[in-house]
Swiss-Prot record:
CC annotations in GO: cytoplasm
Pathway: Cell wall biogenesis; peptidoglycan biosynthesis
Membership in a protein family: Belongs to the MurCDEF family.
EC number: 6.3.2.8
Top-level EC class as recorded in UniProt: ligase
Gene for this chain: murC
GO biological-process terms attached to the record: cell division; cell wall organization; peptidoglycan biosynthetic process; regulation of cell shape
Gene3D superfamilies xrefs: Mur ligase, C-terminal domain (3.90.190.20), Mur-like, catalytic domain (3.40.1190.10), NAD(P)-binding Rossmann-like Domain (3.40.50.720)
Source organism (scientific name): Rickettsia bellii (strain OSU 85-389)
Protein name: UDP-N-acetylmuramate--L-alanine ligase
Amino acid sequence: MLLLELKKTNQTLETIHFIGIGGVGMSGIAEILHNLGYKVQGSDLSENYNTKRLEAYGIKIFVGHTPQNITNVSYVVVSSAINRNNPEVKEALERKIPIIRRAEMLAELMRLKCSVAVSGSHGKTTTTSLVACLFEAAGLHPTVINGGIINNRSTNAYLGSSNYLIAEADESDATFISIPSTIAIITNIDPEHLDYYKDFDTLINAFRSFITNLPFYGFAVCCIDHKIVRELVNNITERKVITYGIDSDDAHITAFNISTDITSSTFDVKISLPNVSGVTIIEKITIPTPGRHNILNSLAAISVGVELDFGIKAIKNGFNSFKGVKRRFTKVAEYNQASVIDDYAHHPEEIKATLSTAKNIANKQHGKVIAIFQPHRYSRMQHLFDDFMRCFDDADLLYITDVYAAGESHIEGISGQSLIDNIIKLKYHNQANFLAKLDDSLEVIMNKASPGDMIIMMGAGNISNFANELPQKFGNLS
């Protein structure tokens, strides 16, 4: 980045091209570079919220991938989703244009900052947003690069005025190990991305490196309610680790006196830091989002705030300012006094957490939970097939669509229909149904929704687009 800064200063501005710029991770980095004064452009297969947002900022966007898109570029940035058969990658290789991985570019942005990297199988995006809110409330105004749209800002990335940078660290291909962070957060570790890691032990070892690569003056924040994280922390002695949890009495930071309602959670916090005498209690912290998993995400942010001495007022004010993250239990529509929720859950553990929250709310409203799930990636479904069969207990009615491939080839025997067939055969759910088309969800909602119901539309594919179009569809029915 120093060389790029020199070239920028000397008025020899070079173009950085992002292949797949509409991806949530890529768009954030592109936006930060643009805001720093670099010349940025990019391409994607289709327009989406992110490409339109970047275009409004003056960033040139190409729809479709062709060699002509990189005619006058000096650097090409790719994510792990872009392979070498991409025509723009082929052109870059042919012309010997440097190809930079997304994680490498993120690392360069973080290198000269005091950086907080948030990783884990689930909860990264919300935790990143919560940490950012606490930094803002403490007057530190960080640069933020997130994996989801932060409702406070209507963007997934923004440039701050301080020397702090907070980033979501994607563990999917082990590149998060190379991120030069000062503070590392691990929310949980579950068997995920095994198409890359091949086995769970390799994934766990990557998280170990994520902590041990910290500088000696840095620290990690880890949730020891999670068995695998606890085992990992117990075997790390060379770096400072702050632990948190709800069920773990031995955690440094714990939540108790928990109460929840439909839109928020309130709890007290007990703080007992290593090498610090005495116990501190923070009473009545409120977060404007429901769910036990979000209390855990909040404890991660509190752990950072306590260690950096933000103060109780800043911590409470930070949470009060939090407005949530797009596609994290987001209400998008209402039909027959039933709420339609759009949620990113696509892993069995995420599905359990989302449905548990929905069940708690539905019970208070004397309603039921209707789950409509779109599986994401054949490889994920293959690796976690048994877990997917067992994760829908809190749904009163279950509907599963076919798999959103996300560019993957079909795997024999892996489909939405096969998942439903096995759920029924093994009696994991007695109200499970297959939806041949996502459009059939509209009929399900119209026929099944009752007052007080929670209709949860889950997945990392295009089910979100469908969910967000429902208000218009309902309007057309009236």
